[in-house]
């Protein structure tokens, strides 16, 4: 087989839990995606390659894993928001028939309702639940605080022993005070608030763990199979090479499923103790209490612009809580360049479980705060809020998106004076914008293999959250080799495949797709090199298309794909790909327009339509991009009108830790959503899972303001808040 030119590149790998930089050899190939107009698969609306498996029930999720002799685990959780454990007696649980393992050393001082205290593995879920009731725990309740407003008080109970309030260091540029004192500016001041929200993944967190000697196999619902592997290895004190993690399919993560977490380590420990495989799946209450949430934020804002609408100054003081963790910060001011800025943000510790990333962490909160302030200031200036944005937004992609979205929503129909719509049920229009990174990075190392029988597979240890990774991986290889997408088998979700990073931050596509493209190009080059020798033609004259191999200028000389692959001999072709920065882009832009109806007698808000215009660079699968936009908008509608975690300050308990009182939109709440994919001619791929959720709530809030002429300063926008704003309650 002809020798291929190679080059050495640096990449990051993880071995036994340790991350380090190494040099590897990869094919030396010029990289470009090519002209989208000439592509058969990429950029088109491609049905999911695993779609039939999912709709017929053949797709295997974590809860579908069934192993011989498998046990079922349950976790005993603290009923107190803060307590000291004086004693634990698990003897009655251990004697219960069917119980195989019990753990009681998980914590001595739980700091939130729902923290893990003990766990059992038994022959059935019912036996495991009964065993939990037989574990007797003596608690000493301790002082606690569950709301950031109370936790800020000097007399509030200390969550970690020290101060509850951290941060607050000013971030400043320009001369803020002088800018606000200028005679030619209009100043707006207000306070805006966004509550914490649960992830509410369709599939709950869970694992199945099975030991084979000193090797562990874990089936996990996770956004990062290698993250789970490394975390389990570290916690169990074994080499990472002894841990295999599998995630064939999963039902969403939204930022909450990056590691093994407590339940993963508990599951593995119980399986080791019991000498049998163990399944541990969390229920909906546990999902709310112990798997994280997106933190809320409250911001006191001061914003100024000249009378002709040029932004001049921004000042904000904000606070939020990540529970017993941190990370409630938001990127303020958001999107629009402001020359004079001063911000302070405070993290407030509370006796609530630790927050985690939630789709576009911090950005939906920042968007609601910034875009509400922008509309309010535009109202004071007497300017069209869209004109005000376009005057202050230098991004050329968003400028084009504004024009496109305004046309599609019929922006000319908006109330020129907010609240002046006739009738009891008033209509209004609003707009808001988004920005996201969407770039990727090195680390993914896929393998493409072509066998002599014509079968083609691509293997990579990434995972598909439901976003369509498996489909575009197959499409990239099919495009490069001139095959039908059904001729390419995409194998992902297993740490036995090549390394790939966690799926989050909209980085997966921009990290995985370039590496798969490089592997597919290398496979094509190797194949063409062999065929050119066998067919005695110039490699440049060989054409791979429509599942055939032809020679340019000689139509009678053609081979079927199987005939061509048979010429490879017994070895076949197996090549690896490495990330190429020339194939990925970053900095995706988007905007959304909302139309709402507000019943001024009941206070009910109905979202009539959302027009969402989103950029993502080179589109790999248009159908998947449209689906991501629609899904993001629905989460944004939910954030705007429904979601809020409610706590009882007297008991520290979450009052709506279920899917009955924790409100989510139903089918009747879904508006008409027009998803517009803005084709940005960069020729490079970017991620876009996050940005569609960012501006929705802000656009809806601004539409409500346009309808009734009153600002709802906090989410969710409930009927009670609307009626209060109208002075009717």
Per-segment meaning from a language model:
Residues 73, 216-220, 455-460, 607-609:
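Short, aliphatic-rich beta-strand segments
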Residues 131-134, 220, 229-231, 254-260, ...:
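Short acidic, glycine/serine/threonine-rich loops at helix termini
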Residues 2-9, 18, 95-96, 237-244, ...:
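C-terminal catalytic domains of large/alpha subunits in multi-subunit enzymes
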Residues 223, 438-457:
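Active-site-adjacent "gating/activation" loops or surface patches in catalytic cores
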Residues 277, 284-341:
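Active-site cavity-forming subdomains of large catalytic enzyme subunits
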Residues 2-231, 337, 351, 355, ...:
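Extended, polar/acidic
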Residues 249, 253-275, 279-282, 470-476:
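Thiamine diphosphate
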